[in-house]
Swiss-Prot record:
Belongs to the class-II aminoacyl-tRNA synthetase family. ProS type 1 subfamily. Homodimer. One of its GO terms (biological process) is prolyl-tRNA aminoacylation. CDD domains: ProRS-INS, ProRS_anticodon_short, ProRS_core_prok. Transmembrane segments: none annotated. It comes from Persephonella marina (strain DSM 14350 / EX-H1). PANTHER family: MITOCHONDRIAL RIBOSOME PROTEIN L39/PROLYL-TRNA LIGASE FAMILY MEMBER, PROLINE--TRNA LIGASE. This is Proline--tRNA ligase. Catalyzes the attachment of proline to tRNA(Pro) in a two-step reaction: proline is first activated by ATP to form Pro-AMP and then transferred to the acceptor end of tRNA(Pro). As ProRS can inadvertently accommodate and process non-cognate amino acids such as alanine and cysteine, to avoid such errors it has two additional distinct editing activities against alanine. One activity is designated as 'pretransfer' editing and involves the tRNA(Pro)-independent hydrolysis of activated Ala-AMP. Its EC number is 6.1.1.15.
């Protein structure tokens, strides 16, 4: 492809709204343009990258036995109401009304639609298993679209759905897809982690995320270098047995005056006691209005995702000052004793002795509190946020933390959707049973951004070879020089004949502008045709490591054959 005939609108400066490297460089290098907040146009270079990513995904989906389909973007509200997700998704779900007053969802996912297709067309165990996938535009009404392709209101996804006759068979389908995902991300050339994850609004029994490691990513991951355990912080566990304090003999309960002292740090200083022996009592309001108290050790943070999952809630929030007042609870001095709401405790509190809690009276705390002598929680639950240094739940070695971008997510759904939508099959004994499902997503457009976040420098993008828009970039530094033009044209012709995807910069612009654009665009290999042709030389450059090498023109064939 000749640059003079292509469309590469590069920019010297990034737009003011571009904050992260992928947003900055994809716009500056002419891969995308913004139409509105969270909406992007894919220009020729960007579209080529998308097609490369989609091609790799299709290859391994097909190899895994998945069948490609294309489902409508719009889904009737009735389908989403059958599963209850019309309300669960809340404001993030785009809802549209047609001229007849009928409501539809602009699909962020397609569980309802694909399950409806299956329930209408598959009735016998002989028709199972099946696995369908599509690459389709999705929609999510983000409150604050940001970071370019990372968090948009419109995005491209590959979503797949497996249908099996039993959980045992569904697990096999899940494992097949998990292995296919590993192959996809390996071939994409990305540094990623497969991590245990929360099932979220999709629901299901368990799930894994595929996270590309990047600084300041939205996904927070804890992982173990020793055994390979990795989990999203929302789902991560730690070995709490190794985080206990030594046992103590119980001391008499005592109420102490703590004027104006309410935070863990202040109580620790005032009473001269380790923060691990101070227990926070947090009052939460669940989405149905239920108030619950949750105890957690003073040095640990509560994981609201675990809380929501335990109570099977849609959402929760910390009680406000007004809500605490309505409950008759004294803000700043909340404790478990004497509360009129259910009290639950994190596992960090289970074997704690002689600890401190609020006395539910202004300016007072209890010390030397012990369970079950002084109160008894309804249940002990893992509500803690795992963090760096915690013992690994598998091998007990210290955990590490990193950040990244979620680019893939797989779920073993079980029968959540098939039961809600009455997608049943008849087994070999003539009994009707719900189909067991799995679902598997990959953010195609987000992968483009993730690759740039992980692979760039101060000059621009450094594309992994398998998804680069072109493999070779030929720069003719002075296209008006007949010798330079002749050599560059000859190399361009040879590269095309060898089946190499090549971009030939034949524009009549300065060498400096060509080099800047080449660095911005980030094509893996570069042949620079300049003044060296007078000595029978051209320069070979590698974008990834910046390595430069001058070779004889008659060695070009050998170089091209190695690409």
């Amino acid at each position: 492809m000749r640059a003079s005939q292509y469309f590469i609108p590069t920019l010297k400066e990034a737009p003011a709204e571009a904050e992260v490297p992928s947003h900055i460089y994809l716009i500056r290098a002419g891969f995308i343009r913004q139409l509105a907040a969270g909406l992007y146009e894919y220009l020729p270079l960007g579209f080529r990258v998308l097609k490369k990513i989609e091609g790799i995904i299709r290859k391994y989906m097909d190899d895994a036995g998945a069948l490609e389909v294309l489902l409508p973007i719009l889904a009737p509200a009735e389908l989403w109401q059958e599963t209850g997700r019309w309300d669960v998704y809340g404001k993030e779900l785009f809802r549209v009304e047609d001229r007849k007053g009928r409501f539809f969802a602009l699909g962020p996912t397609h569980e309802e639609t694909i399950t409806d297709l299956v329930r209408k067309n598959i009735r016998s165990y002989k028709d199972l298993p099946k696995n369908f996938y599509q690459i389709q535009t999705k929609f999510r009404d983000e409150a604050r679209p940001r970071y370019g392709l990372i968090r948009g209101r419109e995005f491209i996804m590959k979503d797949a759905y497996s249908f099996d006759i039993s959980e045992e068979m569904a697990v096999k389908s899940y494992e097949i897809m998990k292995e296919a995902y590993k192959k996809i991300f390996d071939e994409l050339g990305l540094d990623y982690l497969m991590v245990e994850a929360d099932v979220g609004a999709i629901g299901g029994k368990y799930s894994h995320e595929f996270v590309v490691k990047v600084p300041n990513g939205e996904a927070h991951i804890v992982f173990c270098d020793n055994c390979g355990y990795a989990a999203n912080v929302e789902a991560a566990k730690y070995e709490f047995e190794l985080d206990k304090l030594p046992p103590e003999d119980e001391k008499p309960l005592e109420k102490v005056h703590t004027p104006g002292v309410s935070s863990v740090e202040d109580v620790s200083r005032f009473l001269d006691i380790n923060q691990k022996k101070i227990v926070k009592t947090l009052v939460y309001i669940l989405d149905d209005g239920t108030a619950v108290a949750v105890l957690i050790r003073g040095d640990r943070e509560l994981n609201e995702t675990k809380l929501i999952n335990y109570f099977k809630a849609l959402d929760c929030h910390l009680a406000s000052s007004e809500e605490l007042k309505d409950l008759g609870i004294v803000e700043g001095f909340v404790g478990p004793m004497g509360l009129d709401i259910p009290v639950y405790a994190d596992i960090s509190v289970k074997d704690l002795h002689n600890f401190v809690v609020g006395a539910n009276e202004e300016d007072y705390h209890y010390i030397n509190v012990n369970i079950p002598r002084d109160f008894k929680p309804v249940d002990f639950v893992d509500f803690s946020t795992a963090r760096e240094g915690d013992p690994c739940p598998v091998c007990k070695k210290p955990l590490n933390e990193t950040t990244g971008l979620e680019v893939g997510h797989i779920f073993l759904l079980g029968t959540k959707y098939s039961e809600a939508l009455k997608a049943y099959f008849v087994d070999k004994d003539g009994r009707e049973k719900p189909i067991v499902m799995g679902c598997y997503g990959i953010g195609v457009s987000r992968l483009m951004a993730a690759a740039v976040e992980q692979s760039h420098d101060e000059n621009g993008i450094i594309w992994p070879e398998n998804i680069a828009p072109f493999k070779l970039h030929i720069l003719a530094l002075n296209i008006k020089d007949d010798q330079i033009k002749t050599v560059a044209e000859d190399i361009y012709t040879k590269a095309k004949e060898k089946g190499i995807e090549v971009l030939f910069d034949d524009r009549d612009i300065s060498p400096g502008a060509k080099f800047k654009d080449a660095d911005l665009i980030g094509i893996p290999y570069r042949i620079v045709v300049g003044r060296g042709v007078k000595n029978g030389k051209v320069e070979i450059q590698t974008r990834k490591d910046g390595k430069k090498e001058e070779i004889d023109i008659n060695e070009i064939d050998n170089f091209l054959d190695r690409l």
